[in-house]
UniProtKB/Swiss-Prot annotation:
PANTHER family documented for this protein: INSERTION ELEMENT IS1 1 PROTEIN INSA-RELATED
Its biological purpose: Absolutely required for transposition of IS1.
Family, similarity comment: Belongs to the IS1 elements InsA family.
Keywords from the UniProt entry: DNA recombination, Transposable element, Transposition
Organism ancestry: Bacteria, Pseudomonadati, Pseudomonadota, Gammaproteobacteria, Enterobacterales
Additional free-text comment from the UniProt record: IS1-D is an iso-insertion sequence of IS1.
Protein name in the entry: Insertion element iso-IS1d protein InsA
Domain of life: Bacteria
GO biological process: DNA transposition
Keyword Transmembrane: no
Entry-linked SUPFAM superfamilies: Homeodomain-like (SSF46689)
Length: 91
């Protein structure tokens, strides 16, 4: 069986990295015993992808509700509200 060494993104240590359960999506979580930070390799934050802000604004202008927009895009309602609140500010 092949061994893959995983390094800590915070302190770059490779010898003190241990598995630390799974996320709600089923992805493996890791813990660094040196700096005590936890992380997962397959993490993606949907709300920060390019074009998300414009999609939220477009859906709001086309009459789609905030909760429906959140459900369709797979982000939280608070994310939708934050984007709409900040849409008046320059980006």
């Amino acid at each position: 069986m092949a061994s893959v060494s995983i390094s800590c993104p915070s302190c770059s240590a490779t010898d003190g990295v241990v598995r630390n359960g799974k996320s709600t999506a089923g992805h493996q979580r890791y813990l660094c015993s040196h700096c005590r930070k936890t992380w997962q390799l397959q993490f993606t934050y949907t709300a920060s992808q390019p074009g998300t802000h414009q999609k939220i604004i477009d859906m709001a202008m086309n009459g789609v509700g905030c909760r429906a927009t959140a459900r369709i895009m797979g982000v939280s309602l608070n994310t939708i509200l934050r984007h709409l609140k900040n849409s008046g500010r320059s980006r």
